Swiss-Prot record:
It is found in: Cytoplasm. This is Guanylate kinase. Belongs to the guanylate kinase family. InterPro entries: GK/Ca_channel_bsu (IPR008145), Guanylate_kin-like_dom (IPR008144), Guanylate_kinase (IPR017665), Guanylate_kinase_CS (IPR020590), P-loop_NTPase (IPR027417). Pfam families: Guanylate_kin. It comes from Helicobacter pylori (strain HPAG1). Residues 5-183 form the Guanylate kinase-like domain.
């Protein structure tokens, strides 16, 4: 069984800053693996297939579901999103910290697969700030943004199921917090075999 203490799940509303914080972690911690989501939505401006997402057709995605290729999948804003199994298991076997950027539905399912995973909810201070960010991003219509805000409020109702909360007001401060969380993953007490440690300690002291 691989060490699921090396899993870090980032969730929260679109526009809260998950992608920015994920990129920062990859820059600061060399031995990381970003779990690339597979989606049926169209690429936004500047997005590259295989770098930001694996973009596939709905037919291809459904075939993946039938073959059991996804750890989790969900329909969000009328598009399919999913997490592939093989790359995650390979990264864990190699001792890497695996980072997920997924929605709240995906978080719930992943925690069933990996109960020791650490989860962080990232949000703005309020919905007005989130709305401003989405408008500035310029990739969604006003109607889509309103749907995102409604969905964001629903996601906020799930806060209690997460280990940490980051209110992303000050980006530099948020970077410090997420880096601190990531660095402590492998040092959590639950990750250790207490019996083995105690025996080793006793033998060394004799």
């Amino acid at each position: 069984m691989h060490n699921d203490f090396n899993l870090l799940i980032l969730s929260g509303p679109s526009g809260a800053g998950k992608s920015t914080l994920t990129k920062y972690l990859q820059e600061k911690i060399p031995k990381t693996h970003f779990s690339l989501s597979t989606t049926t939505r169209k690429p936004r401006e500047g997005e590259v297939d295989g770098l930001h997402y694996n973009f596939v057709s709905e037919e291809e995605f459904k075939q993946g579901i039938e073959k059991g290729q996804f750890l989790e999948w969900a329909i969000v804003h009328n598009h399919y999103y999913g997490t592939s199994k093989i790359p995650v298991e390979k990264a864990l076997k190699e001792g890497k910290i695996v980072i997920f950027d997924i929605d709240v539905q995906g978080h719930e399912i992943l925690k069933k697969h990996y109960p020791n995973a650490c989860s962080v909810f990232i949000s703005t201070k309020n919905q007005e700030i989130l709305k401003e960010r989405l408008l500035l991003r310029g990739t969604d219509s006003k109607e889509t943004i309103e749907k995102r805000l409604i969905n964001a409020y629903k996601e906020m109702q799930c806060l209690e199921s997460f280990d940490y909360l980051i209110i992303n007001e000050d980006l530099e401060k948020s970077k410090e917090i997420i880096l601190s969380i990531a660095k402590t993953l492998v040092h959590r007490l639950k990750a250790f075999n207490f019996e083995k440690i105690c025996k080793a300690w006793k033998n060394e002291s004799l």
